[in-house]
Amino acid sequence: MPVRLVVTLKQSVRRCLYRRWEGQVVGRELRTKTVALERMYRGNTPYPIGRTRRTAKVYASHAEGARALKVMAARRRARGYRVA
């Protein structure tokens, strides 16, 4: 059974279409690392990637809405997200 698992892991490494990560089978374990292309695509977010939450709140003025967006971006940055 473990042998079949290693074969499956090797096939999945080979089939990784968009080069999101690179894998290497060492003994019976699969070691993966994120490639630079994936880091460019999703920034520094923890995997899996998801959309940032947006509220459907309506602000009184354009300036107030813009300020709220800046506050949200600052909060994301503080939590370790890289804002593009």
Please provide the spans of the model-predicted regions:
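Boundary/linker segments flanking structured domains
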Residues: 1, 73-84
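Negatively charged, low-complexity tracts enriched in Asp/Glu with abundant Ser/Thr
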Residues: 1-14
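Local beta-strand/beta-hairpin segments that build beta-sheet-rich folds
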Residues: 4, 55-56
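Short secondary-structure boundary micro-motifs
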Residues: 6-8, 41-43, 65
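Short aromatic-glycine-(Arg/Gly/Cys) micro-motifs in beta-strand/loop hairpins
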Residues: 14-55, 79
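A short, charged, amphipathic alpha-helix used as a generic interaction element across diverse proteins
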Residues: 60-78
